């Protein structure tokens, strides 16, 4: 082991191997270094590796040279930007914001745009719950009220049936308000209808005519005009001072 590595510090053994130097002396260390350097040069000269280090450092020299000079193969930054803008103009001519607009919002925007564009060509203009038909052949626009409630105009309906109830009578009736033109005619017809088949008619009986309006409030006859009553009545109740039954049925 000591012979192979030559690490023995004994001068006797080193003289046998042909190395006459002492590792403890500085001059001996320099001599060994020069010897090793000579052997290295011989080895490189033998195998033709004299330019190995130069070849290894050549790419680094090229890199340093390229860092100081512009690369001829690189494109001009202005040309690259112009080509990018040109491609974007070909693909999509519209302005796209960031973040991108969702597909549902794009569809809604296109639909809203078409709806507004068609609205200007439509002869009907919507204003709240009223529709005004603009006709060039008619001097005055026609106005109609939109609504499915019973408070619509009585002239626009063919019939208007209202439920009627009288105190002491178990069965309610329905009458067409459009067949009457005043409170008196309606009251007389209702009293006659209820007392004709009921044994409840008395001369000293007083009747109170009440009705329920469109807002749900109960009103007396005469609180509003007949026209408003005919348009807003939902239910009628006739109260008797002396009913046949001792219970009063108001609904």
Curated annotation (Swiss-Prot):
Compartments where located: Nucleus
Keyword Ligase applies: no
GO cellular component: nucleus
Expression triggers: By auxin.
Molecular function as annotated in GO: DNA-binding transcription factor activity
One Gene Ontology biological process: response to far red light
This protein's record includes keyword Nucleotide-binding: no
Motif (EAR-like (transcriptional repression)): 3-7
Residue stretches in coiled coil: none
Domain of life where this protein originates: Eukaryota
InterPro entries: AUX/IAA_dom, AUX_IAA, PB1-like
Alphabetized UniProt keyword annotations: Auxin signaling pathway, Nucleus, Repressor, Transcription, Transcription regulation
Entry's transmembrane regions: none
Annotated ranges, domain PB1: 159-246
Function description: Aux/IAA proteins are short-lived transcriptional factors that function as repressors of early auxin response genes at low auxin concentrations. Repression is thought to result from the interaction with auxin response factors (ARFs), proteins that bind to the auxin-responsive promoter element (AuxRE). Formation of heterodimers with ARF proteins may alter their ability to modulate early auxin response genes expression.
Comment, domains: The N-terminal half of the protein contains two conserved domains I and II. Domain I includes a slightly degenerated ERF-associated amphiphilic repression (EAR) motif which seems to be involved in the activity of transcriptional repression. Domain II is required for the correct degradation of the protein through the SCF-mediated ubiquitin-proteasome pathway. Interactions between Aux/IAA proteins and auxin response factors (ARFs) occur through their C-terminal dimerization domains III and IV.
Similarity-based family: Belongs to the Aux/IAA family.
Assembly: Homodimers and heterodimers.
Name of the protein in its database record: Auxin-responsive protein IAA29
Organism: Arabidopsis thaliana (Mouse-ear cress)
Gene: IAA29
């Amino acid at each position: 082991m000591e012979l192979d590595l030559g690490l023995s510090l004994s001068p006797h053994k080193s003289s046998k191997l042909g190395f006459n130097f002492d590792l403890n002396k500085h001059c001996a260390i320099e001599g060994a270094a020069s010897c090793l350097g000579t052997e290295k040069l011989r080895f490189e000269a033998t195998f033709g590796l004299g330019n190995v280090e130069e070849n290894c450092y050549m790419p680094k020299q090229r890199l340093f040279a390229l860092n100081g000079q512009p690369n001829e193969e690189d494109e001009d930054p202005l040309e690259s930007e112009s080509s990018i803008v040109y491609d974007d103009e070909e693909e999509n001519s519209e302005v796209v914001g960031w973040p991108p607009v969702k597909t549902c919002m794009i569809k809604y925007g296109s639909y809203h745009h078409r709806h507004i564009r068609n609205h200007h060509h439509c002869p009907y203009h919507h204003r709240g719950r009223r529709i005004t038909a603009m006709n060039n052949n008619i001097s005055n626009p026609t106005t109609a009220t939109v609504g499915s409630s019973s408070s619509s105009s009585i002239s626009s309906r063919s019939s208007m049936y209202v439920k009627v109830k009288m105190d002491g009578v178990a069965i309610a009736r329905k009458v067409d308000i459009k067949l009457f033109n005043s409170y008196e005619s309606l009251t007389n017809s209702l009293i006659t209808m209820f007392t004709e088949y009921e044994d409840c008619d008395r001369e000293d009986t007083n009747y109170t005519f009440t009705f329920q309006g469109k807002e749900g409030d109960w009103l007396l006859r005469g609180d509003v005009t007949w026209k408003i009553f005919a348009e807003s009545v939902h239910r009628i109740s006739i109260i008797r001072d002396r009913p046949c039954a001792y219970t009063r049925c108001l609904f």
